[in-house]
Amino acid sequence: MIFKNTELYNISEIEAAQNGSFNMLRVPKSVEKGLSSDAAERNKNCCGAEIRFNLKGDKAKLKLRMPEGSAASRATVLYGSIYSGWEEAVKTIYDRETEIVVSNPYDKEALKRLTEENRLPFDSSLIRIMLEHSNVQLIDIEGDTEPPRKEQTPERKYLAYGSSITHGSIGLNAPNTYPNR
């Protein structure tokens, strides 16, 4: 799904939440109507979802939140397949508006070289915000961005679905689980 010139990967659509933000749905709302109430609630779980984009300007600002009273969640920032710098690699998302600011990497050429030498699957200029678990809500995305191009992502896709460990929602370091590698 494309939202404000970014791709919401593994998200089929968004719906307005009562707090003014958006719930990101893994399957369309029309499908959710045939599910049990527990399964319908799991439809809002963002495990395995990513916000992907190319940064055309200097920076982008993502505004996310957890539902009120929810435990915090995390987002991991990658340049292609490579973790961003230590100051922005992992961000905590709270039950209030949380801003994640992403800038261009310090050394784009080094990232490009490492990606090519190691045959990494994602283009190093593609910014990926990996959402780990829970109902992360989207408020807004600001900045000069464009969606990924087809050649920036692996041709083959892998979908893991099953228990929370299988698809990564309860793993201690979700970006390093088998489905995410």
Pin down the residues of each PLM region:
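Short helix-loop-beta junction
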Residues: 178-181
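N-terminal secretory targeting modules
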Residues: 1-157
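Catalytic nucleophile-elbow at a beta strand-turn-alpha helix junction centered on a G-D-S/GDSL motif
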Residues: 156-176
